């Protein structure tokens, strides 16, 4: 039986099972900013050699969050690591898997070279980026071991990460369901600045397997625009626009996002508005961040937006133990790619604040 057909049969069986147990479907998923802020702190902690200060500041003692394991493996031929850690709470009956983001400029460069087109089959779910697939395979055993511990078998699972960490989270979560370690309704995923991980076939399979999943995007963060999607050539940009075009929801050749985007067009300070991006194309809502045309020759603002979420510089915040008294430099002057943010936000019909 072909792999794609085997996966389709497996997926149909899985959906039948989940319907009996009351699957947590997309229509039930509600973005929780308080929860997202906590997961951002945990994602920041992954950049530190010692994650315990962030864990202690993120959760109350009553939740009894305990560090279960840490991992760091060589990701590529220059020795860049794929790393993360796993936290467990017996009180909440919850396991949280956290992946670290890009740590060095050389690693960012390698990601750029190898994310041009999804080309590696991911267990019959569709094609994904080879570099991300390699990182997933090298870290998977640590996740599998943790979720297979008998006393934790019924615990809910959260998966999170920033940047590269978000990409690894995006592969880890559907693999958990695919391998039968958890049912769909037991998993929640929130990522920050996640790049496109696979093609549209992977996107559709992911959405079925992990319905509670959000990609948080800060304004003009450049990374979620990479690798580029195939543009819908049937779309005619309006007169006077910058010529930006939506992703083609049919093409299987390029990158295509999965999960619901949560877009913050501003600086993500306390009280800033955000959008739940459920418009078309599905998972690539052209009324949200994908409406911005990114100039890869001038990415200062886009890189700043990528490193700064919820008012903190993510890697430095984690290295500083997630100390809320830390101060960070403000954003550069918003020009070019972000000049459209105000008008886009103003005409967007779906605002949840």
Swiss-Prot record:
GO terms for molecular function: hydrolase activity. SUPFAM superfamilies: alpha/beta-Hydrolases. Keywords: Disulfide bond, Glycoprotein, Hydrolase, Lipid degradation, Lipid metabolism, Secreted, Signal. GO terms for cellular component: extracellular region. GO terms for biological process: lipid catabolic process. Its EC number is 3.1.1.-. The active site is at 163 (nucleophile), 221 (charge relay system), 306 (charge relay system). InterPro entries: AB_hydrolase_fold, Fungal_lipase-type. Gene3D superfamilies: alpha/beta hydrolase. It comes from the Eukaryota. Residues 1-22 form the signal peptide. Disulfide bonds join 277-288. It is found in: Secreted. Glycans are attached at residues 32, 64, 267. Belongs to the AB hydrolase superfamily. Lipase family. Probable lipase. This is Lipase ZK262.3.
């Amino acid at each position: 039986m072909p792999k794609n057909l085997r996966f389709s049969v497996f997926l149909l069986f899985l959906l039948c099972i989940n319907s009996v147990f009351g699957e947590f479907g997309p229509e039930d998923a509600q973005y929780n900013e308080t929860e997202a802020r906590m997961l951002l702190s945990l994602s920041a902690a992954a950049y530190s050699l010692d994650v315990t200060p962030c864990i202690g500041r993120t959760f109350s003692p009553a939740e009894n969050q305990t560090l279960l394991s840490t991992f760091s493996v060589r990701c590529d031929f220059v020795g860049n690591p794929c790393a993360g850690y796993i936290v467990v709470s017996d009180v909440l009956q919850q396991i949280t898997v956290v992946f670290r983001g890009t740590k060095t400029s050389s690693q960012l460069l390698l990601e750029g070279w190898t994310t041009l087109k999804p080309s590696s089959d991911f267990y019959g779910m569709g094609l994904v980026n080879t570099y991300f697939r390699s990182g997933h395979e090298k870290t998977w055993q640590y996740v599998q071991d943790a979720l297979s511990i008998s006393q934790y078998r019924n615990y809910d699972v959260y998966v999170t990460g920033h940047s590269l960490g978000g990409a690894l989270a995006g592969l880890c979560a559907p693999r958990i369901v695919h391998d039968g370690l958890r049912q769909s309704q037991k998993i929640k995923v929130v990522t920050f600045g996640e790049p496109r991980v696979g093609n549209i076939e992977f996107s559709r399979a992911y959405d079925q397997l992990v319905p509670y999943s959000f990609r948080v995007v800060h304004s003009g963060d450049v990374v979620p625009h990479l690798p580029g999607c195939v543009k819908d050539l049937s779309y005619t940009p309006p007169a006077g626009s910058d010529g930006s075009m939506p992703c083609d929801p049919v093409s299987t050749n390029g990158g295509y996002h999965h999960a619901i985007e949560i877009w913050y067009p501003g600086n993500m300070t306390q009280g800033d508005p955000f959008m739940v991006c459920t418009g078309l194309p599905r998972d690539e809502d052209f009324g949200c961040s994908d409406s911005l045309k990114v100039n890869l020759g001038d990415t200062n603002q886009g890189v700043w937006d990528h490193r700064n979420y919820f008012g903190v510089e993510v890697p430095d915040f984690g290295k500083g133990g997630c100390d809320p008294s830390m101060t960070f430099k403000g954003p550069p002057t918003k020009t070019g790619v972000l000049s459209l943010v105000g008008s886009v936000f103003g005409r967007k019909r779906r605002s949840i604040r």
